[in-house]
Amino acid sequence: MKILSWNCRGLGNQTAVDVLSHLVREKAPNVLFLMETKQSMAEMRRIQADLPYHCMVAVPSVCRRGGLALLWMVDVDLHVQIYSPNHMDALITKDNSFWRLTSFYGWPEEQRKHKSWQLLKHLHSRSSYPWLCCGDFNEILCMEEKQGQIPRPLRPMQDFKEALLFCGLADLGFHGNIFTWDNGRLGEDLVQKRLDRVCANMEWRDMFPHDKVSHLQVSYSDHFNINNRTTQSKKEKEVVKAL
């Protein structure tokens, strides 16, 4: 299964929609998570009509701010359990095994970042299923994940680390450029950060030990998209079924 997560920074012009369509054709994700769509429900329905996804749950933007959409192929057994302007929590069934997918968008405002970690901890309390959590967390874990301008204070990074530890989530790493966002400036004014990532608990990592995460650059948006590919061997499927 392929899962693609992208902070598209708005789908209000044809260029953005064309880039998205090309991305879907090229990478063929089974599940697509979009953040900051800046679209109404009706607008997202029109975009969906041009994509190969029969299923969608969307949170409309408010005054052209925010907006989420989770789209999936008809052959994916996915059921969204709860959602908000900052997340979508779904249960996926495959080969008689169950696992949980949380698509996450952290608060970008500095004074509200604590709400991201409160939400993450609340989601942790809802289920003990194998758990994959991906998206734009709007925070870094260490100074190596930022380049340019002044260093990030330690406290916000520590809060993020503590939230992941509390939830039993571990970063799955990546292939490609370490940074997933930049401010589009040049020279000394350029700032780059790793804001987007994929995390999972031990149960999920045991279920999908050959998972691969890639950072993919696109011509539109200041964010890379995150492509996550999950595979299970026949032996691993049998173990999961037996549990």
Regions found by a protein language model. Give the residues of each.
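A shared catalytic/ligand-binding motif for oxyanion handling
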Residues: 1-243
